[in-house]
From Swiss-Prot:
Job of this protein: Probably mediates the hydrolysis of some nucleoside diphosphate derivatives.
Example GO molecular function: manganese ion binding
Species of origin: Cronobacter sakazakii (strain ATCC BAA-894) (Enterobacter sakazakii)
Gene behind this protein: nudL
Residue sites binding Mg(2+) per the record: E83, E87
UniProt keyword list: Hydrolase, Magnesium, Manganese, Metal-binding
GO biological process: nucleoside diphosphate metabolic process
PROSITE patterns: NUDIX, NUDIX_COA
Name of the molecule in the record: Uncharacterized Nudix hydrolase NudL
Motif (Nudix box): 67-89
Cofactor entry: Mn(2+); Mg(2+)
Residue ranges occupied by any Nudix hydrolase domain in the UniProt entry: 29-160
Taxonomy, superkingdom: Bacteria
InterPro entries: CoAse (IPR045121), NUDIX_hydrolase-like_dom_sf (IPR015797), NUDIX_hydrolase_dom (IPR000086), NUDIX_hydrolase_NudL_CS (IPR000059), Nudix_NudL (IPR023735)
EC identifiers of the protein: 3.6.1.-
Length: 192
């Protein structure tokens, strides 16, 4: 980031919107969506969760609220908003969706669409005990600092994957979540 502080207005002016996917026509059974919640503050924050240790997949990992698209979802955006409400009690009407990032393929076979939205600073988060162990906020300027992410090349089932690693306080941010944050940084013009 440049030396001046990252304000919400500055973030929004640099965010180059992609056309949001609004219909279900392109969806198949392996689609998922996550909400990338930017907290509206003079110096914005990025809301993240730590998944419950009891979950079958990605237990204990830092993640954005989100999950698989289900039959009731009219769109990928609707899926992200529903999941955010289920996991951390963010009301869909409180989210100002500003766009989507390119979909990411997960190691579990889902194509995950990150939905970027602005949320008010005074929301009372209530973590779903079955899914979320903790909810925390990271300063957006710090989250988007590309130098904080370190690559790790792994080989799985004969395929090469590059994942990104970082720490924030006592939280280990890596994998798809770190990749989505990096993509957001690149989307607003940060240089690697």
């Amino acid at each position: 980031m440049e030396n001046s502080p990252l304000t919400l207005d500055r973030f929004l002016s640099r965010f180059q919107l992609l056309r949001p996917q609004m219909s279900r026509s392109s969806l198949n059974q392996r689609q998922a969506a996550v909400l990338v919640p930017v907290v509206r503050r003079p110096e914005p924050g990025l809301l993240l969760t730590k998944r419950a240790a009891t979950l079958r997949k990605h237990a204990g990992q830092v993640a954005f609220p989100g999950g698989a698209v289900d039959d009731t979802d009219a769109s990928l955006i609707a899926a992200a908003l529903r999941e955010a409400q289920e996991e951390v009690a963010i009301p869909p009407e409180a989210v100002d969706v500003i766009g989507v990032l390119p979909p990411v393929d997960s190691v579990t076979g889902f194509q995950v669409t990150p939905v970027v939205g602005i949320i008010p600073p005074d929301l009372p988060y209530h973590a779903s005990e079955d899914e979320v162990a903790a909810v925390f906020e990271m300063p957006l300027a710090e989250a988007l600092r590309l130098g904080r992410y370190h690559p790790l090349d792994i080989h799985r089932r004969g395929n090469h994957h590059r994942v990104w690693l970082s720490w924030y306080q006592h939280y280990f941010v890596w994998g798809m979540t770190a990749g989505i944050i990096r993509e957001l940084a690149l989307q607003i013009g940060e240089k690697p």
